[in-house]
Amino acid sequence: MPYYNKKEYPKQIWVSQIPEREVSLLRENLAGIKQTTFVLMKKEEDFHQLSEKRSRDIIFLSSNQSLLDLARDVDVPAIAYQKPETDTFLHADMVVEGFEEVDMTFLQRVYERHFNIPWTILETERCIVRELELSDLDDLFSMYAEPGMTDYMEGLYEYEEELEYQKAYIENMYRFYGYGTVSYTHLR
């Protein structure tokens, strides 16, 4: 089962001010994805509808910084298209120079990172491997309390300090490196 079927995902992809060649590549990469609607915005005014929509249903792609800023203001995940060899730098959840490799899994990952949803790395009938989230902290402390757990590695900080450390780690490292500390859950 594809990754994007597992959790929340963007139900609409809004696109504005992206070259037609790049839009064609994106459509090609998303061919066969039935659960997501592709919305090609013709006018900037169309974007103001976002404030009336449920932002968790949308991911926005644009090369216009003022529209990307509007997306941020209404809590919509956004991908900036940065034209290659351009001197200006756009700000968004993710910046791309082309859509050759942008597929639904990529969009899903940007969407999840925006809404702080931990990535599922692997799922089988017997286990799930996903990024650590703050709700795992109690289990982490239980695991580290086992005999021999810290014989060859550092232990955890005190609970509140570890909580702050993990918050900062998730906020900064997950976004910067594209992955984070993983958690393994045995299902059977």
Label for each model-derived stretch:
Residues G148-I170, Y177-Y179:
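Conserved GNAT-fold acetyl-CoA-binding loop/helix
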Residues E44-S66:
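Conserved Lys-Pro-Asp/Glu-containing loop-to-beta segment of HAD-superfamily phosphomonoesterases
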Residues K7-E20:
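Asp-based phosphoryl-transfer active-site loop
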Residues L25, I128, E133-D151:
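Short amphipathic alpha-helix that is part of the acyltransferase structural core
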Residues F60-H91:
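Acidic, Mg2+-coordinating phosphoryl-transfer loop and its flanking beta/alpha structural elements
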Residues T88-M104:
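Structural recognition of alpha->loop->beta junctions
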